[in-house]
Structure formats: structure tokens, C-alpha cells
């Protein structure tokens, strides 16, 4: 690859990154406001915790804090509220007595599925006016972005 090709690729990469960084928050605000307006009975940080526990059953309160970028005491208070709502269950880790693991309850799973369905419905409504070709382009672009993010995360772990 020539220097000009590398410069062009970097410029294109930066332009694409700018577009992603500007678009994702707009979409997230739209989804959050839509989920809220449809009567969600949970805060967005709590919804994020449900998502984390769905992907990583047995996560700890510290894991929740890292995921939300909050202190462990803040995460613990949030989890306490979720336990009181019967959305999350705390259990002693059988392999490490001082560690508490978190799992979703049936009510937590149901609420997460309902919230995801609401969000998907909202996005489907947003995309309803697009042509099949545009929808394919959007889908392909999102798949490429998800693959790139996954590859980046994997490379950071090794």
C-alpha cells in the first residue's frame, strides 16, 4: 500500500469514526426516550445492569460498577434497589465465599426482553420508510462495525 493509499485510508477511517461517534448518541437518545415514553418501570442504568447480567450471568457488583463506570458503592446501591424489585438475585459464590454473584430473576429477564422488544419496535418504526436496498446497507454497515468492535476488544484482551 502506498503512502497516499495509507493517508486516504486513515482519512476515510477518521471520517467514518466521526460519523459513528455523532450518530450513536442520537440513536441512543431516541431509543431511551421511546422506551421511557412506553412506560418502562426501570432506570436506564438498571436496564444496562439487566443487559450485563443477561450476557454475563454470575457477574459481581464490581463488574457492574466497571460496566456502568461508577464506584462499587454506587453499583451496590443500584443492585440493592434491583434486588428489592425482585429483578436481580444475589448469591454467595460457592468457590469464593467473600464474593457475591448476581443473576437475573424471571422478572428481570421478562423486563429486559420487554424493554428490548420496545426498543426494536421503535427502531423498526424509524427504519420503516427506508428502501430494502438502504436497509441492507444499514445492516451490512452495522455488522461490519460490530465485527470491528469485537475484534478490537479481543485484541485488547490478548
Predicted feature locations:
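Terminal interaction helix/tail motif
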Residues: 11-23, 114-158
Amino acid at each position: 500500500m502506498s503512502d497516499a493509499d495509507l493517508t486516504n485510508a486513515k482519512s476515510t477511517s477518521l471520517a467514518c469514526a466521526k460519523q459513528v461517534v455523532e450518530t450513536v448518541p442520537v440513536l441512543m437518545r431516541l431509543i431511551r426516550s421511546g422506551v421511557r415514553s412506553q412506560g418502562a418501570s426501570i432506570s436506564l442504568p438498571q436496564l444496562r445492569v439487566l443487559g450485563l447480567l443477561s450476557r454475563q450471568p454470575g457477574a459481581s457488583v464490581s463488574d457492574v460498577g466497571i460496566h456502568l463506570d461508577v464506584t462499587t458503592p454506587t453499583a451496590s446501591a443500584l443492585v440493592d434497589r434491583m434486588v428489592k424489585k425482585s429483578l436481580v438475585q444475589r448469591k454467595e459464590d460457592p468457590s469464593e465465599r467473600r464474593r457475591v454473584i448476581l443473576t437475573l430473576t424471571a422478572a428481570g429477564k421478562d423486563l429486559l426482553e420487554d424493554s428490548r422488544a420496545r426498543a426494536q419496535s421503535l427502531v423498526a418504526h424509524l427504519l420503516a420508510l427506508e428502501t430494502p436496498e438502504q436497509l441492507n446497507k444499514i445492516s451490512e454497515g452495522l455488522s461490519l462495525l460490530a465485527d470491528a468492535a469485537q475484534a478490537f476488544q479481543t485484541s485488547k484482551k490478548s
